[in-house]
Amino acid sequence: MDFSGKNFTAQQLEQLYRGILLPRMIEEKMLLLLRQGRISKWFSGIGQEAISAGVTLALEKDEWIMPLHRNLGVFTNRGLPLHKLFKQWQGARDGYSKGRERSFHFGTREHYICGMISHLGPQMAIADGVALAYKLRKENKVAVAFTGEGGTSEGDFHEALNVAAVWGLPVIFVVENNGYGLSTPVQEQYKCESIVDRAKGYGMEGVQIDGNNILAVYDTIKGVKEYCIEQQKPYLVECMTFRMRGHEEASGIKYVPDELFTVWEQKDPLKTFEHWLLKENMLTTIDIESAKTEFKNYIDTEIEMAFASQQTIVPVTKDEIADVYATWGQADTKYTVNVIGDVDNITQSSLVVHEKRFVDAISEAIYQSMIVHDNLIVMGQDIAEYGGAFKVTEGLVNKFGKERVRNTPLCESAIVGTALGLSLEGYKSVIEMQFADFVTAGFTQIVNNLAKIHYRWGQNADVVIRMPTGAGVGAGPFHSQSNEAWFVHTPGLKVVYPSSAVEAKGLLIAAINDPNPVLFFEHKALYRSVSGQVPEEPYEIPIGKARCIEEGEDISIITYGAGVHWALEYAGKHTNTSFDILDLRTLSPLDYEAIAASVSRTGRVLVLHEDTLTGGIGAEIAAWIQEHCFTLLDAPVMRCASLDTPVPFNIELEKNFLAKARLDECIQRLLNY
C-alpha cells in the first residue's frame, strides 16, 4: 500500500492514526464483550475504518454526515463520548435515543450526524437537502452521505444522485464497496465494471480509491470537497475495501473464500498505516504503545462507567406518546396570526373577507406563508413556470424565484428526503405530489424517515406534503385514489383533509407553521367547484379540531372532504330528518371530543368517507365509538364507503364505485334499525 507522495505534517499523520486506532480498539472490545455475553449484538466495521476516519477528519465539524451502521469512526472522530455511545448501543434511557433506537441508527444535532434507517438508500437524499440549504445560504460547506455497494442497487441511490446533479448540490456520495451486501457478492449486485462509472450518467465527476489507505481517503475527500464547493456540484467517491467480520457476528463469514481473507489481511488499514509510520519515523514504537494504552484506559473507563450507571428502563407511556410529535405554539412563528375556531361566524368578524375558490384559498395560503417564512421552500413536479398540474402554485416563481419554488425531477422519494435534509438546517418545505396516488414512490421516506425521526432522536421534520386526491373526475385508478388511511395508521404524521375554501387556507397555514410532518389532502373535485368567504390576511384553523356544520337529533354523519358536501346535499333533500353533520377536518389526530358530542346528540352514527370500506378510517372511528360511547347508541355504528375495488375510469362505473351511491341506503338502514 502506497502512503507516499502526500504532503502531511507529523501532527496530521498522528491525528489520522489516532482517528483510525480508536474505533478499531473499541470494536475489539465490543467483540470481547460479545463473547463474554455482556452485550447481545454487534455490527462490525473492522477492515473499513480508514474510510469513516478519513472522511470525517477531512470535514469541518459542522458539516452534516449521513453515516451507516459500520461507520463507528464517524462517531468517534466527531467526539461523541464513548460511555454515552455504549449506552446507546445497549438501549439505555440516557443514550442518544432514550432506548428507542439500536446501534448507529440515531442522530445528534450537536455533532451534525443524521442517523440512518435500515433501508439504507433513503439516507442519501437527506444529504441533498442539507446541501441545498448550504447552497441557498451560500455557505462553503458540503454534505456527505455514506452507502455500500449493495445500497447502490436501490432506486434511492439513483434519485439522490440525479437530484444532486440536476440542482448542482455540494454533496459527496461515499460508496464503501466491501464486496458483499450481507452475503451477496458484487457480481450478483451489479454488472458495470465499477460503481464510479455510473457518475458519468449523472453528469458528475467520480473517483475510485483505495478505501484502506487513510491518507488516500483523507486527501481525496479534501480535494473533492474543494471541488464541490467551488463548482457547486456533487461528486461520487467509490472506496474499495473489505469487511473482515460478518454482517453481524451471528451470521459468520462462511460465504467469503479463504483466499480473499488472506489478500485483505495484508491490506489491513490500521496495520499497514502503522507499519508505514514506523518505517518513515513519523511515529515511534513508544508513541504507538502510548496511544494504545491511553485508548485502552479510556475505553475500559468509559464502558465500566456505562455499565455501572445502567438501569432498567421503567416505561412511562405518556412520555413515549408525547415524544412522537414535536411541540409548538404561536410563539414559534414569526408573526401574530389569527386563530379561527368558528368559521361559521367569519363574516361577522372584524376580518376582511372575499369570495374565493377552494384552489385559490390554497394558493393564497402558500403565498402568504412564503412571505412570512423566508425559509420556506416549495417543491414538486412542474410547479414553477407551469404552476403545477392544478395551477395551485401558478405565479409563485415570479414572486419568489426558482431557488424557493423548485421544479423537481420525477423522483418523489428523493424530494421527500431532500425536504427532511432541509429541515435539519432549519428550513420548511411544502411538497406537491402531482397526484396523491404517486406518493407510493416516496412511501419509505414518509413513514420511516419523516414520521419516526422525532420519536427516535428529537429531530423534527418540518415538511408539508400536499396531496391532490379523490375521484369523481373520471381520472381512473391511478389518479383518483383516496389513500389517507395509509398515513393515519402511521404514528408521527398529521393528516389534514379540508372540505371548504376557508378551512383549506387556515388549515394549510397551520400545517406549514407546525414543525411536524403533515399530509395535506386536497380533493381535486373541490378545487373549482367549491368557494366561500375567506379572510384576506393569514390565519390558522387549529389542526386536530373538527367542526359541527349542522346540529341535529336523528342521525350523526361523521365525514370529511367531499363527504361533507354529499352529506349536506342529502340533508337538504331530506328535511324530515334532523342530521348532525360533523366535518372531521383533521384525521390524525382525531377530535374525539367532537365525535363523542355528536354521538350524544343523536345516538345513531354513520361514518361516511370516499375511501374504500375495508381498513378505512371509518372502521377506526366506529371502533372508538363502540368502546367509548356504547351506552349512548341506539343502533350499531354504520359505515358508508366506496367499493373495495380500484377506482374505475368510466363515469357510470365511477359513480357506482363512490360511497355517495350508497348513502341513501345506509341512512335508511340506520334510521330503520
Pin down the residues of each PLM region.
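Conserved acidic/glycine
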Residues: 1-51, 245, 249-400, 625, ...
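Cofactor-binding active-site loop characterized by glycine-rich and histidine/acidic residues
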Residues: 25-28, 32-167, 185-191, 196, ...
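Glycine/charged-rich beta-loop-alpha catalytic/anionic-binding loops adjacent to active sites
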Residues: 32-38, 103-117, 141-146, 179, ...
